[in-house]
Amino acid sequence: MRVLVPLGKKQVTGIVYRHRTEPITNDSIQIRPILAILDTTPIVTPHQLWLWEWISRYYLCTMGEVMAAALPSGIIDDNYKARTVTYMDWEQGMTYEQAQTLVLRSKKQLAMLQYFVEHYLPNKGIERRELIEGSGESPAILRALVDKHILQEVKTSVSRLIPYQGTIKPAFALNDKQQRAYQQIQLSWQQHNTVLLHGVTSSGKTEIYIHLIQEQLAQGKQVLYLVPEIALTTQLTERLRRIFGNQLYVYHSRFSSDERVEIYNEIKNSIVEPQTQKAKLILGARSSVFLPFQSLGLIIVDEEHDSSYKQQDGTPRYHARSVAIMMGHHYHCHVLLGTATPSIESYYNAYQEHKYGLVTLAERHAGIQLPAIHGIDLKRQYHRKEMYDHFSDPLVERIREVLEQGKQVILFRNRRGYSSYIQCSKCGQVLKCVNCDVSLTLHKHRFIQVGEEQLTCHYCGHTQTKPSHCPTCGGEWKEVGFGTERIEDELYSLFPKARVGRMDLDTTRNKNAHQDLINQFAQHQLDILVGTQMVTKGLDFDNVSLVAVLNADSLLNTPDFRSYEKAFQMLEQVAGRAGRRGERGEVIIQTFMPDHPVFGFLSQHDYVGLYQHEIAERELFHYPPFYRLIDITLKHRNNDRLLAASTLLQERLHQVFGDRCSPIIVPSVARMNNAYLRHILLRIEGYADIQRAKELLMESIHYVQSIRNCLGTIIIPDVDPM
């Protein structure tokens, strides 16, 4: 349970983890009293505390840092406020007959009283707002009834969680191939705690999930259904709600702190009241692994390959898939990893190491063919002058044909904004962020209410107005690179009658923005949807005939050993949005490298070919799954202090780990938010004692942080970086 304790001059909230039984003999240790016990019952379960401890050990952080990530802020800060609704009820002892005699001279008071009587609910009354709006009378009339002691106001706490009031429908029956996969999963669970379901896009994996969920709920178990992006919960929530009703709860960061507290408490209370039908199925993003489950029967990790499952900033830098697998062992529950494009590590564990079971769904539902994938050589198109801005002539013509057929189009560009940066056409100056060593991105539509073009840093959020001319030489600006905003403008020029929507971080900042865009496209209120990677993930639209990737090369040209894997996954996933119902879909990929091996695997939807290519490279160059990686980030606002700390740490680690320790790495963005950055990478053999390696690493980190010349250096180890 939570306690309030003094820490220096502050008061902080903590959770009692253990009782110390042995006496303290060290006189230098000062015992300070607990100021207050904040709870009468435990706020976390023993299962959660076990998980927090495992995460802190594995990801090299403190349990306090895990707690801060795990609990809604309203619980930690004790600032949760219940939502109250005012109801009107009879004043004690008042009867209808008595009330009539008190309002005979006022027709308005009598009218409101009549409405109250007609809509009165025993032991509850009627909501104040409903009484005013329903009767058509003013608040002053209601105040008169209160002043006459006819009615009284009763404030009642109500949930912010809106119950489902629609019709519950049965799940669809599985077809033969789905039924076979369902049975294979059940058999695999007899030997493996974790099973990988490798099913091509639109093969019906979600239907299999639903039947597995039903089986667990029938046994009184809880199910955690993880998705990598909040956007994915939108369509999926509607689908699951129609089957599971109020057993389904959704949990992610777009909810307010108070809403998250209420969901957390509902799940915790379902432990106390196991007969309740609420909070049995939890659909959520990665932070859902921290909820207070007690009787987990199944964890589903959908799109298990997605890097969004990894916490990239702050601490703990956990991976929800790894946490889910560990939870499966602790709770003795099944874990199902599902995807059309498995991570190399997961496929290796299933296909070669047999640590996981492996079940394959190789065909789409209802016999629909996988989309045909065509490449367009941009070098040839530019040479022939067959381009309109960033659209090749063949792509423009194909979009026109699809729109004329009444079908829809998805365009993918994994860069938001209008232009990547602006550059002086005379002196070559590029405007950079004042806080970071990175160029500013031009936005034209995000700040439309400002009426000016804006330059924004996508790292720290710094924004400034675009100057009319170069501040150095007065030259004109040229716009370099293109993002989703520019594509949107070009589409309006090419297809002035088309209804175009844009899905990126800028258009989906509001709580319901994802839902609104998805609904508009699903209801065919939009013809073309332009988007970043949000459009690649799990969305299911009936009428999409064509998907186009405007520049696939940017996915491949990154300094990341996973770049080919990630490019294949992203392109195969976005291709999977085409032709999900009825006729076969089509995918057009614009590239300057049409002969790249990734496009060869992609054109055949050959994941296994890509895997075999990648796994050989990984083994040769000492990367996962054969080696474990720990990326150490060092930060300091003083570059000299940072250099001293990074040099000392690298020397100590090299003494301990030898060539497993890299030289100091200067990142492409070497200063972020006014802090200078350096990296050191550790490669540890898969067969080595990784926990001992972590202990040696932390000893070196603590030593460096104790050196006077290195004080203030923030050192963050990232275990299994993405």
Q: Where do the PLM segments sit?
A:
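Conserved RecA-like helicase motor-core motifs
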Residues: 224, 244-255, 434-437, 441-443, ...
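Accessory, non-ATPase domains that flank or precede helicase/AAA+ motor cores in DNA-metabolism machines
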Residues: 1-339, 351-368, 656, 681, ...
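Conserved helicase motor
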Residues: 227-232, 249-262, 284-290, 415-416, ...
